[in-house]
């Protein structure tokens, strides 16, 4: 049996486009959650008093749901590996002014991408190849190695229980 080392997918993303908010204001919030665990991120976003927190919270929920559906991963093993904010197009509206004139109002938009990584999965796994005859070969995928007892750093160990939606 030959064994071949292959790279598996351990990251899942959620993308929010044309969110009506300044990219600078969204970056202030995104910089606080980058590199943190999923549960810690939920606590931070629910307690921060900024308007940018709600769309980012929805994207974090969506990325966790994508990881659960695509990789069958547990929420306690998820970490925000990448989070980036880029500027979108500015929507233009007209504001009526005196004497029949009008001024343009530019509303900035931004695109937010949240990438979630499962720390319990190995990045590489072996593919076993059985040669049945010289013309056909079948590949068997070994099961994913999951470490369920692995826990990420816990910032709040005072026993506070937070509601996870």
UniProtKB/Swiss-Prot annotation:
Keywords: Chloroplast, Plastid, Ribonucleoprotein, Ribosomal protein, RNA-binding, rRNA-binding. Pfam families: Ribosomal_L22. SUPFAM superfamilies: Ribosomal protein L22 (SSF54843). It is found in: Plastid, Chloroplast. InterPro entries: Ribosomal_uL22, Ribosomal_uL22_bac/chlpt-type, Ribosomal_uL22_bac/org-type, Ribosomal_uL22_sf. GO terms for molecular function: rRNA binding; structural constituent of ribosome. GO terms for cellular component: chloroplast; large ribosomal subunit. One of its GO terms (biological process) is translation. Belongs to the universal ribosomal protein uL22 family. Part of the 50S ribosomal subunit. This protein binds specifically to 23S rRNA. The globular domain of the protein is located near the polypeptide exit tunnel on the outside of the subunit, while an extended beta-hairpin is found that lines the wall of the exit tunnel in the center of the 70S ribosome. This is Large ribosomal subunit protein uL22c. It comes from Daucus carota (Wild carrot).
